[in-house]
Curated annotation (Swiss-Prot):
The name this protein goes by in its record: Carbamoyl phosphate synthase large chain
GO biological process: 'de novo' UMP biosynthetic process; glutamine metabolic process; L-arginine biosynthetic process
Region (Oligomerization domain), start-end ranges: 404-553
Annotated organism of origin: Vibrio cholerae serotype O1 (strain ATCC 39315 / El Tor Inaba N16961)
Obligatory cofactor(s): Mg(2+); Mn(2+)
Pathway(s) of this molecule: Amino-acid biosynthesis; L-arginine biosynthesis; carbamoyl phosphate from bicarbonate: step 1/1; Pyrimidine metabolism; UMP biosynthesis via de novo pathway; (S)-dihydroorotate from bicarbonate: step 1/3
Amino acid sequence: MPKRTDIQSILILGAGPIVIGQACEFDYSGAQACKALREEGYRVILVNSNPATIMTDPEMADATYIEPIHWEVVRKIIEKERPDAILPTMGGQTALNCALALEKHGVLAEFGVEMIGATADAIDKAEDRSRFDKAMKSIGLECPRADTAKSMEEAYKVLDMVGFPCIIRPSFTMGGSGGGIAYNREEFEEICTRGLDLSPTNELLIDESLIGWKEYEMEVVRDKNDNCIIVCAIENFDPMGIHTGDSITVAPAQTLTDKEYQIMRNASLAVLREIGVETGGSNVQFGINPKDGRMVIIEMNPRVSRSSALASKATGFPIAKVAAKLAVGFTLDELMNDITGGATPASFEPTIDYVVTKIPRFNFEKFAGANDRLTTQMKSVGEVMAIGRNQQESLQKALRGLEVGAAGLDEKVDLDAPDALTKIRYELKEAGAERIWYIADAFRAGMSVDGVFNLTNIDRWFLVQIEELVKLEAEVKAGGFAGLNQDVLRKMKRKGFSDARLSKLLGVSENEIRRLRDQYNIHPVYKRVDTCAAEFKSDTAYMYSTYDEECEANPTDKDKIMVLGGGPNRIGQGIEFDYCCVHAALALREDGYETIMVNCNPETVSTDYDTSDRLYFEPVTLEDVLAIVRVEKPKGVIVQYGGQTPLKLARALEAAGVPVIGTSPDAIDRAEDRERFQQAVQRLGLKQPDNATVTAIEQAIEKSREIGFPLVVRPSYVLGGRAMEIVYDEQDLRRYFNEAVSVSNESPVLLDRFLDDATEVDVDAICDGERVVIGGIMEHIEQAGVHSGDSACSLPAYTLSQEIQDKMREQVEKLAFELGVRGLMNIQFAVKDNEVYLIEVNPRAARTVPFVSKATGAPLAKIAARVMVGQTLEQQGFTKEIIPPYYSVKEVVLPFNKFPGVDPLLGPEMRSTGEVMGVGATFAEAYAKAELGCGSVYPEGGRALLSVREGDKQRVVDLASKLVKLGYQLDATHGTAVILGEAGINPRLVNKVHEGRPHILDRIKNHEYTYIVNTASGRQAIEDSKVLRRGALAHKVNYTTTLNAAFATCMSHTADAKASVTSVQELHARVKANQA
């Protein structure tokens, strides 16, 4: 049946900010849904609070609202836009929960809005654990023994039934949030209390443990005529007990017999029918006991998910796009498959003749004190996917694409160390982020496949594959470079060995291996992802490399530009950089260039087969990029858009004769190399905080006496502030050198005078060699010392004088010309006592580019991409800075709730995973919306606790009187209370934890506070007050760790975040009117 004509406009709910467990795969699905529905002629209204997404670009929908995904705000949008239908299956758990709230509060009924894609009942049946259990029993499928509990009392009753170990999961949460595995009563109590607190319905599911079982996922699509297809069967390499988002996964499933596959296939179709998913994609998870083959169903998601993004990229079948069309009445046989150019309908199940491996990317090094063992709560922040002709090639490509410094199965353990075996056994049994490398070490240490299986429960088939790779490495090592003949080298390349890994095994340079390959003419060929195992001709250039005979790349001789993507998401390099890469591809495609994308992140829009003309799904390493350049011969390569990943390759690419366009690699180096940069700064006569570069600890102490404390210390060349700290005295400085870094002539350490209480400012600008245009000046809300990626910011600036801003504009222009920037640049300043200090310059796309583009309506990444290929700013009509007639505030989202034990104090090391944007007529309204967007709801009044550091005591009086005016009663710790008392404000005095009971923590646990302001500096003070911040986090009390944020919060109390809604299109029209 063709599409429905009784609905004209559809509201799509996005997923909001990126958090662990819900990342940019929902930008990919939402963007696809917008495109699919608009090409069918529907009016699309989109709501998403995350500005760093492609789906919130003004061209993607008819009306785009960057507003909080909160049911009261969405009600305002429904009232204004009057959509006929709402599609909630594209925005993850956030969108489902919001849709259920709209249903519950009667909003959908009030405005006559129909839910499409999934009914409220189907969502509820799949999400509500007890209803799901009953439903599965009714169709003869077994679930793990389990029951729900709404209190600790009930939880203990369930425990008697399931026994230890048991798995605890809160209802309606995402990425296993708040869940875990309990092995004893103490852990059981801790996880249950946390889980009851985190579940929006205060309900837990307690399951028997299936630890060590095999885990599978089926991606299923069903239409309203009951046509069903399995898009992909995914097998988890890691067994049950590790969240599937943290597992290495493989597609197609490798260890199922055909009979088992058919049983599972039939079961998944039965699940969709029973739950009532009539239109769209779902993912169904199964566990199989390897001992007796008992199969249980673990859960199903009645929506597009992380796995469906992976399945789409793995097969070339666009699940989200198809699901969106099914939601408006199409059936699978009516839709044509794009990849085969319409030669096959969407009702053909994809078949694949290659192996896909996904490996998660973790960031534990950023969370000191976090438990880094993997459990049922998701902890990874990104993922990489690789495609190969066999499991071994696929795995090794994924390992090098991960960018954790591994070129393959690199050694982790020194096997001669006395505790080597103990260490390996621990790492195999208690899985951490690096288990796969320890498995290889176990084989090197002589363990058998059975020995490894007994510790890991990983299927022996996978272990044999790894064991063989380890044996091959040993043979190659023994044969030496001389023994690397044509046959051996070709065999190693077919098994996925990188040049870098071979060079490490043989002790020669990577270049020598590359020369040898050239001599033997051993080069990769490119095969196409075509959904049909080459049965039909593919129109789509979606390629992966392998060492085979026939190459299917068929390059053209058009003018081509190649964009290098950012690889897997991680903290400090996320979706913002992917956004820039997509914009580069779109802009140059519009201008008639053929665009080529190289990336290996399955979650993103950049790896969608129709974002660029040609997509190479390959690791972003020197070897892989050079191989593609050899085949495609592009006219230019863009390295400034994918963050640090491609930037690191700039010099080596240039040396290999690759045309790197935009700012030259030498200019990039002048900005990143401390000494070269200082020469430029001195030549221009600009101010920097006093600083020094040291190569030994004694030298550091001598310099620190000249500069003075506090100091910011960090190793040179880092992104996202790795190993960066603020030290307050000499003793602290010595500790840093002993614990945090190894300092040497090769790796110097930088010391900078820390400008306490300075205001930090970010500026994005574009230079074409003739003129510099400022994209936006953003004033940070958190003071200097908080990493710019973790600070909220306002555009336009909300306190800076015109004079200071003009000083910055002048300096930006000088710097751009001095460094020879062609394209984007980002500059960070600090303002203190009316002086402007230069902190750093990055001649590349920064993470603020999407936010500035949304706030001003100027697509900076597109404009700069055109500058790189030679268009001037004047030709593009972008010649002056746009200052919008409204305020936009960017606020960040932090993942501390996933890492109990980590201090949530903000500092110079970046730890946020995502961002939201709020827009308002005043700064207060914009800030209030941004806070609501990241889920902080500040109650009116109540009791506030103030405990601040020495340097903040002057300003705390002002803050206290503002809080009193807002109706708060105040508590304060001793030092703060004295200052307030002198000013005539008398707070209740409370004890610090070591001062006797009842102390602060008791009061937090009793829910006495609605707001906490706690600032601390100096090692000891930070350590002492950590319990207060952890307590606030654990008991969901709103807290701020900087005074600036506290003042901004007070201001936001004067505005109503839910009062008005404005679309991006309306905002940009206002900007244009204002310009005129």
